[in-house]
Swiss-Prot record:
Chief localisation class: plastid
Alphabetical list of Pfam families matching this protein: Ribosomal_S7
Name assigned to this protein: Small ribosomal subunit protein uS7cz/uS7cy
Domain of life: Eukaryota
GO molecular function: mRNA binding; rRNA binding; structural constituent of ribosome
A GO-annotated cellular component: chloroplast
Annotated gene: rps7-A
InterPro entries xrefs: Ribosomal_uS7 (IPR000235), Ribosomal_uS7_bac/org-type (IPR005717), Ribosomal_uS7_CS (IPR020606), Ribosomal_uS7_dom (IPR023798), Ribosomal_uS7_dom_sf (IPR036823)
Subunit record text: Part of the 30S ribosomal subunit.
UniProt GO BP: ribosomal small subunit assembly; translation
Function: One of the primary rRNA binding proteins, it binds directly to 16S rRNA where it nucleates assembly of the head domain of the 30S subunit.
Membership in a protein family: Belongs to the universal ribosomal protein uS7 family.
Segments passing through the bilayer: none
Record localization: Plastid, Chloroplast
Length: 155
């Protein structure tokens, strides 16, 4: 038994403009080489572009995109008796959102295009509509979990 106290789970802070934790989580994942102001700039410009494209609230588009990409279940490699099995596991909401953000940014970085603002806004709009690489990644993960359902008892 540990003599130390249990660590408190840190909650994400909200960003200055939208006052939203999800936006701050996204900014922290866009961040490269400690340039947070540039990450904020990229996201806010992408939100403006979404506003122009869809003529709706960009925050609701972001929420819809993340909700659409968030997986319910994932696979984890487990070594059992000399062979490695892909074991399906359920994912909590926080971990699911983190995965969704990672997939959205990965898909937007892979997109061909001019700059990150354009690519990110396009990927978010596509994900909100139910298409795009990030949605495909989620469906692929769900398919993988369904295929390996027989190994669910290895948890």
């Amino acid at each position: 038994m540990s003599r130390r106290g249990t660590a408190e789970e840190k909650t994400a802070k909200s960003d200055p403009i939208y006052r939203n934790r999800l936006v701050n989580m996204l900014v922290n994942r866009i961040l490269k080489h400690g340039k947070k102001s540039l990450a904020y700039q990229i996201l806010y410009r992408a939100m403006k572009k979404i506003q122009q494209k869809t003529e709706t609230n960009p925050l609701s588009v972001l929420h819809q995109a993340i909700r659409g990409v968030t997986p319910d279940i994932a696979v984890k490699a487990r070594r059992v008796g000399g062979s490695t099995h892909q074991v399906p596991i359920e994912i909590g909401s926080t971990q699911g959102k983190a995965l969704a953000i990672r997939w959205l940014l990965g898909a937007s970085r892979k997109r061909p295009g001019r700059n990150m603002v354009f690519k990110l806004s396009s990927e978010l709009v596509d994900a909100a509509k139910g298409s795009g690489d990030a949605i495909r990644k989620k469906e692929e993960t769900h398919r993988m979990a369904e295929a390996n359902r027989a190994f669910a008892h290895f948890r």
